[in-house]
UniProtKB/Swiss-Prot annotation:
It comes from Candida albicans. SMART domains: Candida_ALS_N. The gene is ALS1. PANTHER family: AGGLUTININ-LIKE PROTEIN 6, ALPHA-AGGLUTININ. This is Agglutinin-like protein 1. GO terms for biological process: biological process involved in symbiotic interaction; cell-cell adhesion; hyphal growth. Residues 896-924, 954-1226 are annotated as: Disordered. Residues 980-995, 1091-1110, 1155-1176, 1197-1226 have a biased composition (Low complexity). Keywords: Cell adhesion, Cell membrane, Cell wall, Disulfide bond, Glycoprotein, GPI-anchor, Lipoprotein, Membrane, Repeat, Secreted, Signal, Virulence. N-glycosylated and O-glycosylated. The GPI-anchor is attached to the protein in the endoplasmic reticulum and serves to target the protein to the cell surface. There, the glucosamine-inositol phospholipid moiety is cleaved off and the GPI-modified mannoprotein is covalently attached via its lipidless GPI glycan remnant to the 1,6-beta-glucan of the outer cell wall layer. Residues 896-918, 964-979, 1002-1062, 1073-1090, 1111-1154 have a biased composition (Polar residues). Sequence repeats lie at residues 433-468, 469-504, 505-540, 541-576, 577-612, 613-648, 649-684, 685-720, 721-756, 757-792, 983-1043, 1092-1152. It is found in: Cell membrane; Secreted, Cell wall. Major cell surface adhesion protein which mediates both yeast-to-host tissue adherence and yeast aggregation. Acts as a downstream effector of the EFG1 regulatory pathway. Required for rapamycin-induced aggregation of C.albicans. Binds glycans and mediates adherence to endothelial and epithelial cells, thereby playing an important role in the pathogenesis of C.albicans infections. One of its GO terms (cellular component) is hyphal cell wall.
Length: 1260
């Protein structure tokens, strides 16, 4: 019972809901807010805010009632909301749904439903704000073409309606500021589809177009073109906002993919402009980019190609809102004939509720009746207060009679003639006179039948063509008693089945027994094809069966039978997929939608029933092949729009050919509106495509499709920017170099592989302070020389050396490294005395005292690359001893002059590579000139007889060495095509020293005679203290800003070094000191910022005793007895060195011009002067004896027996690691000899190793 009452109440509620009108009663304002920086106040640009007044009276409106506001020429609501409430004093009295017209209808609607809050005693009113955008065109659709004529620039009247209630307001619309003769473009967002409509109109050609290509595409993959929703046409005019107001067909060729659409057209008449629009889907409809193709040739003009790219952004939505006050009405019935209204006191600034007392007359009920007649009559039945009076309205209606006649026209017409004096109207129907008909039946290749009526003009003969598919054929094979076969065909009428009867002789037979599902047994004979074997199948009743049905995850059903032995029970397992669902949508009379699901058994189909309220209706007129008109209604999806299709007689035809994705050709006719021209669209299968990829000079890729005529081959031309190139240099086993380029796919990186033959190798042995040996290989660039550095541990062996023969190395390394080297000399003194007997035919003894000196030299090198990581390398070497009587001579070969020059190209990653033509160069050019005079020493003169002391004075005692090093740096032009001028740094080192050489050895067959000699041995002391000179040379290059040559600065610093020392017999350990300074002060140019100062202080004290001469081979020497006291000899050397830093700055031009160089030339001259005194005789060869004082100046040719103990280490950047530079400079305790190994490589040896090799060679 309760359920029945509930259903009854629901039915009554639905039945009582009605449509009301006039709720929206005023158009208060219409203002524009710029939602996206638009250039002008156009009607189509968001957001137009419409403020409307509304009122709801509870006496005439009930909950559930509906009312609708129609808004012509409104495209959409520019808000993310889907509804707005009509609110007064915070109470929602109605809810309104937004329905945007967009591309579907020429208007938008606001459909509202009254809420339960509205009572019969309440009258609510207020305002609602609606954010909207108007439709003034934008595509070639029929909706946009109609709305393109809604408004004009200037003052317009906007009118909305609620039923029969119109509300209006005047508004000012601004005209577009875009030049209408240029190319035009537009985009609009359709929120309901989340798509965008995009329009492109070709530039204006006053005399028409000869040809052109237009379209748009996206290469980013964030935009997809909807090829099923496009409009292509030519328009004869534009409205004030540059949108087409008409669309006509023309001949073109279309190409459309999801990435873009393009058309090619020809011969467009004067006064028309081609346009194209399409729906596009974007990853973000508020931000996307399109590239437009814009090629056209105006009649009588040259071809134009003006492509462009646009980045589209969205607008900001607005919100809808409502507010108002509440009126409470009280009603009192009176006997008056009219209604009176009394309003109680009300303050609108304080009160939210207004109370109105309504004095109304006795209510009446109207009963409407009808009758066949002409006039309307009224009658009233009165009633007292508290009851209801009745008004009876009798409304006449007319009956009709239909008269049908034939006429000569081609369509049927219907005319109703209303009789003003009688109740019978006449309907006149005129139909075309029918033609006679001829029917033709024929067969065709399709599988279905068609009937086509070809209508002739009035008075002619219509033809009905019936096309039938071929008859089906049934073949029957039977056996007969004959031994041969026959075939008979029985032909049936069209639409029937032909029979083919084959008669065969009988086959042999095989019998099979099986089970089946029936409860009885059968025997079946299966006849095989002629010549085969027939089968006799005996079927037995089956076992009882148990069937199980279950669901599984697959999309198909299976049945599995598990057969039990005879007498058992078989199992049938049925596996079913989940049921399919069929959705049925239907319409009903309610204003809301419902969804009901009806579940079917397994294997069936579930049904979802969706009930929707009725759709809006759009009427479309089209043409067809008949000579008469018809009307068809196409029902759209729920909430969509139903379409009423009116078919009209055909229009003239224009044929257009285009390509599509199928392999066959089709012809489609596009029917234009009545009186216009239909389009026949011929779709051809796509041509074969040949794709060609080539590189060009631009930095972006393009794809161009050259479309050939149907049946030929299209060409796709892909232009790619050149790939980046990575060059790799490697070594291989061949003796020649090769260069191979590996080309990567477009967008990749090409690889240039340079294969070089292996470099020659130079091996250098050095000594360091560690207890183990290591080997390090420094690989030079191709064409250079690799260096193998062997670090050996220090040895305690006593090796003969001459302290006056020293060689230092200017280390080599490759730019852009920066090297800091420090050389430390730590001397350790070990003294021992030896008495060596010498047979001189006398009983006297000549004794020799030897002081052994051991020196340890430690070198620390710090290498930093581009200011990043730094590495430190330390090494120490050097053991110096004075040879005894058993040690042999050390002979050094004269080293010829060595000159080495190289250039290097410094790449961005710090790798040095040999430069080639047309490549900017930078680097250091090093030229070394070295000459060394042979030094020959002999064993201790005390170990053999001496024939004559006077021979000693004639022995040469000068060893000279000169070294000149020149560094030249080519400029670095970073972005130009020309070499920069060079920077040259020239350092000249001139060293003069004198060396006392022992006399020659007396050969073994010499007869020596000597008088007895008494000798007193005196101690000999050698003391050495040495510091180091560290020279840093840094090259950099200033930068020019604009590619022009930077002015050069040529500071020419000069470095001069001099050393003055003196010594006396009384003070053998500390001599007098004078300091000499070296300064480097370049002249200051425009770009110069370099000042370098170097001070070198050296003090040398070198008392030296000249030894006795030795008797040469084959000489008879006689000497008188001599009493000789050997004087103590002390050699003391002190050297102090400061650091020298030379910096060269070279200009760099950032933008491609030449940069003049900065030329920095340094000249370093080192000289040695000394004075010595000793208690010995003066020797004319340049040694100091006998208390006389001899001095030496900075003259290379002058020699003294003074040892210069300066040690210079030059840190100079060089171009290649393979470059070995050897120069001679003074050093006290270190001797490094350089020899050639026969192949051009230089082998460097430390002093003690060279001495050891020489000593071993004497014994061998």
């Amino acid at each position: 019972m309760l359920q029945q009452f509930t259903l009854l109440f629901l039915y009554l509620s639905i039945a009582s809901a009605k449509t009301i009108t006039g709720v929206f009663d005023s158009f208060n304002s219409l203002t524009w807010s710029n939602a996206a920086n638009y250039a002008f106040k156009g009607p189509g640009y968001p957001t137009w805010n419409a403020v409307l007044g509304w009122s709801l009276d509870g006496t005439s409106a009930n909950p559930g009632d509906t009312f609708t506001l129609n808004m012509p020429c409104v495209f959409k609501y520019t808000t993310s909301q889907t509804s707005v409430d009509l609110t007064a004093d915070g109470v929602k009295y109605a809810t309104c749904q937004f329905y945007s017209g967009e591309e579907f209808t020429t208007f938008s609607t606001l459909t509202c439903t009254v809420n339960d809050a509205l009572k019969s005693s309440i009258k609510a009113f207020g305002t609602v704000t609606l954010p909207i955008a108007f439709n003034v065109g934008g595509t070639g659709s029929s909706t946009d073409l109609e709305d393109s004529k809604c408004f004009t620039a200037g003052t317009n009247t906007v009118t909305f309606n609620d039923g029969d209630k119109d509300i209006s307001i005047d508004v000012e619309f601004e005209k577009s500021t875009v030049d209408p003769s240029a190319y035009l473009y537009a985009s609009r967002v359709m929120p309901s589809l989340n798509k965008v409509t995009t329009l492109f109109v070709a530039p204006q050609c006053e005399n028409g177009y000869t040809s052109g290509t237009m379209g748009f595409s996206s290469s980013n993959g964030d935009v997809a073109i909807d090829c099923s929703n496009i409009h292509i046409g030519i328009t004869k005019g534009l409205n004030d906002w540059n949108y087409p107001v008409s669309s006509e067909s023309f001949s073109y060729t279309k190409t459309c993919t999801s990435n873009g659409i393009q058309i090619k057209y020809q011969n467009v008449p004067a006064g028309y402009r081609p346009f194209i629009d399409a729906y596009i889907s974007a990853t973000d409809v508020n931000q996307y980019t399109l590239a437009y193709t814009n090629d056209y040739t105006c009649a009588g003009s040259r071809s134009q190609s003006k492509p462009f790219t646009l980045r589209w952004t969205g607008y900001k939505n607005s919100d809808a809102g409502s507010n108002g006050i509440v009126i409470v009405a009280t009603t009192r019935t009176v006997t008056d004939s009219t209604t009176a209204v009394t309003t109680l006191p009300f303050n609108p600034s304080v009160d939210k509720t207004k109370t109105i007392e309504i004095l109304q007359p006795i209510p009446t009920t109207t009963i409407t009746t009808s009758y066949v007649g002409v006039t309307t009559s009224y009658s009233t039945k009165t009633a007292p207060i508290g009851e209801t009076a009745t008004v009876i309205v009798d409304v006449p209606y007319h009956t009709t009679t239909t008269v049908t006649s034939e006429w000569t026209g081609t369509i049927t017409t219907t005319t109703t003639r209303t009789n003003p004096t009688d109740s019978i109207d006449t309907v006149v129907v005129q139909v075309p006179s029918p033609n006679p008909t001829v029917s033709t039946t024929e067969y065709w290749s399709q599988s279905f039948a068609t009937t086509t009526t070809v209508t002739a003009p009035p008075g002619g003969t219509d033809t009905v063509i019936i096309r039938e598919p071929p008859n089906h054929t049934v073949t029957t094979t039977e056996y007969w008693s004959q031994s041969f076969a026959t075939t008979t065909t029985v032909t049936a009428p069209p639409g029937g089945t032909d029979s083919v009867i084959i008669r065969e002789p009988p086959n042999p037979t095989v019998t099979t027994t099986e089970y089946w599902s029936q409860s009885f047994a059968t025997t079946t004979t299966v006849t095989a094809p002629p010549g085969g074997t027939d089968s006799v199948i005996i079927r037995e009743p089956p076992n009882p069966t148990v069937t199980t049905t279950e669901y599984w995850s697959q999309s198909y059903a299976t049945t599995t039978t598990v057969t039990a032995p005879p007498g058992g029970t078989d199992s049938v397992i049925i596996r079913e997929p989940p049921n399919h669902t069929v959705t049925t949508t239907e319409y009903w009379s309610q204003s809301y939608a419902t969804t009901t699901t009806v579940t079917a058994p397994p294997g069936g189909t579930d049904t979802v029933i969706i009930r929707e309220p009725p759709n809006h209706t759009v009427t479309t007129t089209e043409y067809w092949s008949q000579s008469f008109a018809t009307t068809t209604t196409v029902t759209g999806p729920p909430s969509g729009t139903d379409t009423v299709i009116i078919r009209e007689p055909p229009n003239p035809t224009v044929t257009t050919t285009e390509y599509w994705s199928q392999s066959y050709a089709t012809t489609t006719t596009i029917t234009a509106p009545p009186g216009e021209t239909d389009t026949v669209l011929i779709r051809e299968p796509p041509n074969h495509t040949v794709t060609t990829t080539e590189y060009w000079s631009q930095s972006y890729a393009t794809t161009t499709t050259v479309t050939a005529p149907p049946g030929e081959t299209d060409t796709v031309l892909i232009r790619e920017p050149p790939n980046h190139t990575v060059t790799t240099t490697e070594y291989w086993s061949q003796s020649y170099a090769t260069t191979t380029t590996v080309t990567a796919p477009p967008g990749g990186t090409d690889t240039v592989i340079i294969r070089e033959p292996p470099n020659p190798t130079v091996t250098t042995t050095e000594y360091w302070s560690q207890s183990f040996a290591t080997t390090t290989t420094v690989t030079a660039p191709p064409g250079g020389t690799d260096t193998v550095i062997i670090y050996e541990s220090m040895s305690s062996s006593k090796i003969s050396t001459s302290s006056n023969d020293i060689t230092s190395i200017i280390p080599s390394f490759s730019r852009p490294h920066y090297v800091n080297s420090t050389t430390s000399d730590l001397s350790t003194f070990e003294s021992s005395s030896m008495n060596t007997p010498t047979s001189i035919s006398s009983d006297g003894m000549l004794l020799s005292s030897t002081t052994l000196v051991t020196e340890s030299e430690t070198t620390t090198e710090s290498i930093c690359s581009d200011g990043k990581e730094c590495s430190r390398l330390s090494s120490s070497s050097g053991i110096v001893t004075n040879p005894d009587s058993n040690e042999s001579s050390i002979v050094t070969s004269t080293v010829p002059t060595a000159s080495t020059m190289s250039d290097s190209l410094s790449s961005t990653d710090g790798i040095s590579a040999t430069s080639s033509d047309n490549v900017s160069k930078s680097g250091v050019s090093v030229t070394t000139e070295t000459s060394v005079t042979t030094i020959q020493t002999t064993p201790n003169p005390l170990s053999s007889s001496v024939t004559s002391l006077t021979q000693l004075s004639s022995i040469p005692s000068v060893s000279e060495s000169e070294s000149k090093v020149t560094f030249t740096s080519n400029g670095d032009n970073q972005s130009g095509t020309h070499d920069s001028q060079s920077t040259s740094t020239e350092i000249e080192i001139v060293t003069t020293s004198s060396t006392k050489v022992l006399p020659p050895v007396v050969s073994s067959n010499t007869d020596l005679t000597s008088e007895p000699t008494n000798t007193r041995e005196q101690p000999t002391t050698l003391s050495t203290t040495s510091n180091s000179i560290t020279e840093d040379i840094t090259t950099s290059q200033p930068t020019g800003d604009n590619g022009d040559n930077t002015s050069s600065t040529n500071p020419v610093p000069t470095v001069a070094t001099s050393t003055l020392a003196s010594a006396s017999e009384e003070d053998n350990k500390s001599g007098s000191h004078e300091s000499a300074s070296t300064s480097l002060k370049p002249s200051m140019g425009e770009n110069s910022g370099l000042t370098t100062s170097t001070e070198i202080e050296a003090t040398t004290t070198s008392p030296t005793e000249a030894p006795s001469p030795a008797v040469s081979s084959g000489t008879d020497v006689t000497t008188e007895p001599t009493d000789t006291r050997e004087q103590p000899t002390t050699l003391s050397t002190t050297s102090k060195t400061n650091s020298e830093s030379v910096a060269t700055t070279q200009a760099t031009n950032e933008n491609g011009g030449k940069s003049p160089s900065t030329d920095l030339t340094s000249s370093l001259t080192t000289g040695t002067s000394a004075s010595t005194s000793a208690n010995s005789e003066l020797v004319t060869s340049g040694s100091v004896t006998g208390g006389a004082v001899a001095s030496a100046s900075n003259d290379q040719s002058h020699s003294t027996s003074v040892t210069n103990s300066n040690s210079i280490v030059s840190n100079t950047p060089q171009t290649t690691l393979s470059q070995q530079v050897t120069s001679s400079s003074p050093s006290t305790n270190t001797f490094i000899a350089s020899t050639y190994d026969g192949s051009g490589s230089i082998i460097q040896h430390s002093t003690w190793l060279y001495g050891l090799i020489t000593l071993l060679s004497l014994f061998i």
